[in-house]
């Protein structure tokens, strides 16, 4: 019985090892990207379509504005790891110096064992669309 349990645990560990390696690599990329320091290093991990839209100037301005409004990111906790045939989505709860807790989604494309950021977004998960806020105000 003990042998059977050991085999089952070993087999499940082997099956999930690939996602663990992928996740580790992607989290390192997220850390480098959101450090907001060296655009030239970050472009190595960006999909060409994202690199075309997110120029060095826009990247630097994004972090200047974020630091001014939110402060630096102090902590991020992985909440969801979604796996698709052609990539992954990592969703975090991100805490900032000025107290805000925002959601951070990073979309990766996987090609030949290499990962590149295709898109990302930082948003307030508690924010409501204006129409929803107006409807709630009318009901009161």
Where are these regions (language model features)?
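Bimodal feature
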Residues: 31, 36-40, 57, 82, ...
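Exposed beta-sheet edge and beta->alpha loop/turn motif
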Residues: 81-140
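Generic anion/oxyanion-binding catalytic loop in active/binding sites
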Residues: 6, 31, 48
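Short, low-complexity N-terminal intrinsically disordered segments enriched in polar/charged residues
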Residues: 12-35
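Bacterial N-terminal signal peptides
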Residues: 2-12
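Short solvent-exposed beta->alpha transition segments
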Residues: 24, 40-87
């Amino acid at each position: 019985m003990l042998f059977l349990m050991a085999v089952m645990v070993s087999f499940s560990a082997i099956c999930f090892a690939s996602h663990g390696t992928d996740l580790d690599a992607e989290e390192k990329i997220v850390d480098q990207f959101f450090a907001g320091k060296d655009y030239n290093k970050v472009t190595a991990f960006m999909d060409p379509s994202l690199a075309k839209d997110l120029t060095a100037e826009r990247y630097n301005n994004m972090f200047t504005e974020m630091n001014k409004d939110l402060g630096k990111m102090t902590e991020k906790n992985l909440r969801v790891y979604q796996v698709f045939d052609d990539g992954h989505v990592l969703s975090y709860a991100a805490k900032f110096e000025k107290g805000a807790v925002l959601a951070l989604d990073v979309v990766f494309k996987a090609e030949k064992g290499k990962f590149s950021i295709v898109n990302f977004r930082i948003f307030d998960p508690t924010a409501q669309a204006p129409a929803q806020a107006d409807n709630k105000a009318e009901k009161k």
